[in-house]
Amino acid sequence: CILPYNRVVRDLNGLTVKAFLGALKFNFELMLMPGFPCKPVEKHCMGMYVDGQWYHLKAWPDVYEKKDVVGQLDVSILQEKVLSPVLGIEDPRTDQRISFVGGSHKAAELAELADKTGGVAFVMYPTSMEDLMKIADESKLMPPKSTWFEPKLRSGLFIHKL
């Protein structure tokens, strides 16, 4: 089963919460979801937790190129429209301010992590098997930490006959 690979960023890159939310409005429809974790139910949507509040984010249709199989992934949209330009995370592989949390963890755990540092948590919509196969068929690479698979298989369990 493919689950999302969620993100927690330790700070807002020097921005106030108001300025951070304002920057997101250029690329996303933001809806405050008071009182409960927001888990996305469709592609191009994500949940976000910042400053004690949950938000539902939906990417505006012109934010991503529909024919770009990698660029239209939610993890790509987040990286290109939020993490890099707003939060200053150019390389998520090496930036110490970002953590990746597997989809088997509850949204409340992400909120707790964000609260500890005054940061922000993103609950992603999982990459579909269809998108995964399209990317493989086109010999393209997915962004880092795009998918979380459950159950985890033990190392050495797969044997392929040559």
Can you name each region flagged by the protein language model?
Residues 1-162:
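Surface-exposed, charge/polar-rich loops and edge strands
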